[in-house]
Each structure stands twice: as C-alpha cells, then as structure tokens.
A protein has these predicted regions:
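Short, ordered beta-strand-loop transition motifs
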Residues: 58-62, 137-145, 198-200
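Flexible, processing/modification-adjacent segments and terminal tails
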Residues: 16-33, 39-41, 48-50, 75, ...
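Sec-dependent N-terminal signal peptides
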Residues: 3-13
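A short, compositionally biased
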Residues: 35, 61-62, 85-89, 172-175, ...
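Extended lipid/amphipathic-ligand handling interfaces
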Residues: 25, 54-59, 192-198
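N-terminal, post-signal-peptide region of Sec/Tat-exported proteins
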Residues: 37-75, 134, 173
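Gly/Pro-enriched, hydrophobic low-complexity segments
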Residues: 81, 111-113, 119-126, 145-237
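One face of beta-strands
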Residues: 34, 38, 65-67, 91, ...
Length: 246
C-alpha cells in the first residue's frame, strides 16, 4: 500500500499547474507578525560598499510593513510604510531632510528602494490574479527538488518587469532563487533567498540580489528575528513614520 501512496503523490505533484503552484505558495502558512534588524549592503561595480541598518516590522504576510533607517547617520530617520490593497499598494516615505512624506505612485514602483537593487515593486507581494503562470520543467537546486515557474505580469499589474523565472522547493514551498527580466526580454536581476527555521515557519534570513544591467549588488541579512509578538494594526500608519521605535 505504501508504494501506491507514493505513486499517487508523485502523480499529484506532476499534475499541478503553474497557477495551482502559485496558489499553494500564496496560501503557505506564515507568522502573523514579524520584526527584525535588517542590514543592507550595497556594492557597486568598483567594489565600493555602503551599509544601511534598519528596523523592520510587518503584519499579515508582509502586506503591511514599516521600515525605519538607523544607519548611516545621513539616512537616520528616513522611514517607509507599505499597506497592500486589492486595488493597489499604498507606499509612503518620510524624508526628514525635506520634512515631507513622499507617496510612491504606481508609475514609480519600478524605482530603486534607497539605492538598492530592489525596486519598490520588489517589496510587495505578488497578487496571484495579476499574473499568468506557466510550469516549466522541474529542476534540482542545491540537491533540492524544485518547481520552476514562469511568471508573466498581466497588464493590470502595471509591472516594470516583463517576466520572472522562479525556483520553488517542493517540500517547503520556499522560493530559492529567481531571475527577473525587463520588458525587452533581457535578464535584469538574479535573486537568491535563504531561510531560518523558527518555530513551525521558514523565515527569510538572507536575500542576495545581483543587478546584471547595472553591475551592482545588494545583500540583505535579517537578525534578531521575532515572530507573533502581537503587533497592533494601528502601528502601520503614516503618523508613525516620524517615530523611531525604541
């Protein structure tokens, strides 16, 4: 009987469509809230680096997020708020040097986030309904069996990308790596993701982004990770952009 179960499991895995895999990923269990210290290292083509230290807090699978910059000194006080809606994302930045809150419009979501190789679009979850998914041939990545998905944004997504190729580990549904292409079909970015097992969750520990076109890279590491601490919904409000957390 055991071999029948294994066979049926394999048939089920092989039969899943790209959309079904994307839906599984979207429904993957995650902490109710998450806080961490974030270190972001930017490196240009000459090898010169710049390091940012941030505090990040998020709620509901990162659909609400606040980021406060701590270092370097000239960026201290800059902060970012994101609230995702079905109709679109509300993103705002507090820029203390100008004493103003800047709203990030849909036309600007392809812009770089604080000089990094992540765009504002990269900071948002992808709405499953805003993309077309094609399952490509499965591959092995670092000895892990992976689904491979081609993701093409629909027009309504207003994406700055033409497509993504994503490698997703079958067992954990962790996104291991992704290549993003511009609308001309040229590869633009390669991203690699690493995870830490905390309680019953796989939580992002490190993200590495290589910008092929700009010959620039970004490495983001997360430390002092805390989950399910009961963050309040009213934390994610514009008024708190100006309030550095203790």
């Amino acid at each position: 009987m055991k071999w029948i179960f294994i066979l049926l499991t394999q048939i089920f895995l092989c039969a899943q469509t790209g959309l079904e895999i994307a839906q599984m990923l979207d429904q993957k269990p995650a902490p109710k809230d998450l806080s961490n210290m974030t270190r972001m290292i930017l490196t240009n083509q000459k090898g010169k680096s710049r390091t940012n230290i941030m505090i990040s807090k998020s709620l509901n699978k990162n659909k609400k997020q606040m980021i406060w910059f701590q270092e370097p000194k000239d960026d201290r006080g800059v902060s970012f708020l994101k609230v995702e809606h079905e109709s679109g994302d509300d993103m705002r930045m507090w820029l203390p040097a100008f004493k103003k809150v800047r709203r990030i419009s849909a036309k600007k979501k392809g812009d770089s986030f604080m000089g990094s190789d992540l765009s504002f679009e990269d900071l948002s979850n992808r709405n499953v309904n805003n993309n077309n998914y094609t399952r490509l041939s499965d591959e092995i990545v670092d000895n892990l069996d992976c689904y491979v998905l081609e993701i093409i944004p629909k027009k309504k997504a207003k994406s700055s990308y033409g497509k993504h190729i994503s490698w997703i580990e079958k067992k954990t549904l962790n996104l291991l790596k992704e290549s993003s292409y511009n609308k001309r079909g040229d590869i633009e970015k390669n991203k690699v993701f690493q995870y830490e097992h905390i309680k019953s969750y796989h939580v992002l520990k490190k993200v590495s982004v290589e910008n092929i076109t700009k010959k620039h890279s970004t490495e983001i590491t997360f430390s002092d990770i805390k989950i399910d601490r009961g963050l309040r919904d009213d934390l994610f409000h514009e008024k708190n952009l100006k309030r550095l957390p203790k």
